[in-house]
Structure formats: C-alpha cells, structure tokens
Amino acid sequence: STALVQLREAKQLNRVGVILSSYLTNEDLYAAKRIFGELGATQVVFQRPPSGSHDDFLIQADKSPNAKGAQALGIAEGAEELLEEAAKGELRVLLVFTQDLVPLFTEELVQAAAKALELFVFVGTNANPTAALAHLVLPSAVYAEKDGTFTNFQGRVQRIHAALDPWGESRPDWAILGDLAEALGLSTRCVYAPSIFAELAKTERPFQGMSYQTIGDQGALLKQ
C-alpha cells in the first residue's frame, strides 16, 4: 500500500496496473472496480485463461466461470498491453489476481515485467509461474471457500456457497481488497459478500433488482 500511496501523492496512478481474472466472483470484481476507481487507478482489466476444447454448443472454449460478469461490470478485457507497458518500465506497480499469465504471454514477457516493476503483487490460490516471479504473494480462497455469485455465459447470475473455511492464511479476494482500501484510507468498505452484492445490485444496471434471495437456486438473468 505504501507504493500506491506514493503514486497517488505524485499523481502517477496511471502507472498502476491491475489484472483481474474471470475466475473471480462478481463480488470480487465489483470490490476491485470500486476500490481502484476510488483510488484513481484507471488501468484495470480482466484476463481469461487459455481456451480449452469446445464445440460452441454445450462445451464452451472459456473454462472460467465469470467472464460474462466482468463484462457486465464494464471491465475491459486483455492483459497483454499492461504486461508490455510493465516490461518497458511504463508501469511502477502491477497487481495480478488469480490468473497465471505465463501460459498466455510467455515467461519472457512476465519475467521482463517483474524485473522492471517496483512492485509486482500476485493474489491467488495456487503456486504457479507468475506467482514465482512476483515480489509479493497473497493467498486467496478457492471458490469452495467463498460465498458469492458468478455469471455464466448465458448471462445467468448464480450463487455459490462456501463449503469449507479458507485454508491457512488465505481469504476471499474481496476481503484482501477491503484491507487494501482501509490501508489507503479509502471510503469503500468490503465487510462481507452479501453487502457487497447488495451495493453492486444498486449501482450496476445489469444486476439491478437482484438479491441473493431472488437469485435463489435457479439463478437470475442479467438485464439487457
């Protein structure tokens, strides 16, 4: 957070990059959008994993659960440009959530970015090549340890329920983001998933009128 405070004071938040993931819940994504928006960091994108086998009917190429949710929240897609900026020394801080970038963009590019950055943070559930290159790694909870929602490829918002407590020091991404907001003195608060979704449903038009109760077991379609 110290590096972000320094960049804010120097009016250099254009040199902060944030790469979110389509594996994050709607609550995680919204928390990131709100917090980095309040901070004034505008270079916030999401990245899908590599495409898998598909038939474009029942089997989708995108194996992640929430690209549609990221799009509905108005988050731009694609991490390559930010990585290239980082490798050229145009960014000073880069935060990456969940997605291993090495299989998508080569180890050489991610390594060059890591060397050029003042601070490279990876928030994720598993050890991977991107985490190995990061300067700081924060453990996050897997989906089985989270409450929240995903939006499937048809635009149906669906509930997930935590089956387990987060392992060790890991926590939901929205909670990690909430700590960052508090450390930066921001007004955005991330206390628990239901309150984040309630705010999301008030402020994001595609989700308006939804609640965990109305989503229920069947899900609810995004508004067009």
Regions found by a protein language model. Give the residues of each.
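Catalytic alpha/large subunits of respiratory electron-transfer oxidoreductases
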Residues: 1-146, 162, 180-190, 201-224
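A short glycine-threonine-serine/GTX helix/turn-capping micro-motif
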Residues: 162-170
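Catalytic-loop motifs flanking and including active-site residues across diverse enzymes
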Residues: 172-176
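Short, charged, surface-exposed loops that flank catalytic or proteolytic processing sites
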Residues: 169, 189-193
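Catalytic or ion-translocation cores adjacent to nucleophile or general acid/base/metal-coordination motifs
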Residues: 147-161
